């Protein structure tokens, strides 16, 4: 994994996030909070363990994992998923699986920004973060 992912990132733009949350099955009240949040994402690495912590005024989440190894995750909207993160062509690719559903979250670096593409079925959301 590129060390350029490491550090603190702040959300600067978000496109189609509400539609993505709807596709995930997130309720209206939680979607409203999610749309208001401007989360900070802190990515760190210790040995071969990567940690991604997401902080917002409404909820904080944290996942720690080894690339390619499945782990249990409780998402910000309280889904219990089996998740796996891999590295391919410089992109951190996360797959979350639960109750027969699957969503992907791809994090890549573009012009010094972290571009996060979230996909559920045919709904795609793009969120852009800048390093703090």
Curated annotation (Swiss-Prot):
Keyword Metal-binding attributed: no
Gene3D superfamilies for the chain: 2.40.128.20
GO molecular-function terms, A-Z: cholesterol binding; fatty acid binding
Sites where the protein binds hexadecanoate: 107, 127-129
Superkingdom of this protein's organism: Eukaryota
Binding-site list for (9Z)-octadecenoate: 107, 127-129
Protein's cellular compartments: Cytoplasm
Modified residue annotations for N-acetylserine: 2
Record key words, sorted: Acetylation, Cytoplasm, Disulfide bond, Lipid-binding, Transport
PROSITE patterns: FABP (PS00214)
A GO cellular-component term linked to this record: nucleus
SUPFAM superfamilies reported for this sequence: Lipocalins
InterPro entries reported in the protein's UniProt record: Calycin, Fatty_acid-bd, ILBP, Lipocln_cytosolic_FA-bd_dom, Myelin_P2
Chief subcellular location: cytoplasm
Assembly and oligomerization: Monomer.
Family (UniProt): Belongs to the calycin superfamily. Fatty-acid binding protein (FABP) family.
Note from the entry: P2 protein and myelin basic protein together constitute a major fraction of peripheral nervous system myelin protein.
Main function: May play a role in lipid transport protein in Schwann cells. May bind cholesterol.
Domain notes: Forms a beta-barrel structure that accommodates hydrophobic ligands in its interior.
Protein's recorded name: Myelin P2 protein
Organism name: Bos taurus (Bovine)
């Amino acid at each position: 994994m590129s060390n350029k992912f490491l550090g603190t990132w702040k959300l600067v733009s978000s496109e189609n996030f509400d539609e993505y949350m709807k596709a995930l099955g997130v309720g209206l009240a939680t979607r409203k909070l999610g749309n208001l949040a401007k989360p900070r994402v802190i990515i760190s690495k210790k040995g071969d363990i990567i940690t991604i912590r997401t902080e917002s005024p409404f909820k904080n989440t944290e996942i720690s994992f080894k690339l390619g190894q499945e782990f249990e995750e409780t998402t910000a909207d309280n889904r219990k998923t089996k998740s796996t993160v891999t590295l391919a062509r410089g992109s951190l690719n996360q797959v979350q699986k639960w109750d027969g559903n699957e969503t992907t979250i791809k994090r890549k670096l573009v012009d010094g920004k972290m571009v996060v593409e979230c996909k559920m079925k045919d709904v795609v959301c793009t969120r852009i973060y800048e390093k703090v």
